[in-house]
Amino acid sequence: MSGFSLADLERIVDERSKASPEQSWTAKLVAGGQPKAAKKLGEEAIEAVMAAATGDRDNLTYEAADVLYHLLVVLKIAEIPLENVMAELERRTAQSGLKEKANRQSS
């Protein structure tokens, strides 16, 4: 298994977001603002769903990587650290999924 983590990718996104938009896809997405980055995330998510639905494991792996990358760009623009998302996942896993969902619906 790779030692590469989402935290590593978050650091790369942060570094590349500071580059010139002419030299970095990440910087170009960030410069385009949240609507552009969110649209690209949606496109990649649809491609991942289609790969999953057709059983294309190789393409699903590729598209899943795109989804994770573009999600981190969207989070960067929104100034939401990955640490916050991980804390939310940790909170949710402290209880069953059904209980967590019921708690969300009642609030």
From Swiss-Prot:
Subcellular location: Cytoplasm
InterPro entries: HisE, PRib-ATP_PPHydrolase-like
Keyword terms: Amino-acid biosynthesis, ATP-binding, Cytoplasm, Histidine biosynthesis, Hydrolase, Nucleotide-binding
Pathway assignment: Amino-acid biosynthesis; L-histidine biosynthesis; L-histidine from 5-phospho-alpha-D-ribose 1-diphosphate: step 2/9
UniProt protein name: Phosphoribosyl-ATP pyrophosphatase
Stated family: Belongs to the PRA-PH family.
Gene Ontology terms, MF aspect: ATP binding; phosphoribosyl-ATP diphosphatase activity
PANTHER family according to UniProt: HISTIDINE BIOSYNTHESIS BIFUNCTIONAL PROTEIN, HISTIDINE BIOSYNTHESIS BIFUNCTIONAL PROTEIN HIS7
Primary localization class, coarse: cytoplasm
Known catalytic reactions: 1-(5-phospho-beta-D-ribosyl)-ATP + H2O = 1-(5-phospho-beta-D-ribosyl)-5'-AMP + diphosphate + H(+)
Lineage: Bacteria, Pseudomonadati, Pseudomonadota, Alphaproteobacteria, Hyphomicrobiales
A cellular component annotation (GO) from this entry: cytoplasm
EC number(s) given by UniProt: 3.6.1.31
Highest taxon listed in the record's lineage: Bacteria
A Gene Ontology biological process term: L-histidine biosynthetic process
Protein's UniProt keywords contain Manganese: no
Species: Rhizobium etli (strain CIAT 652)
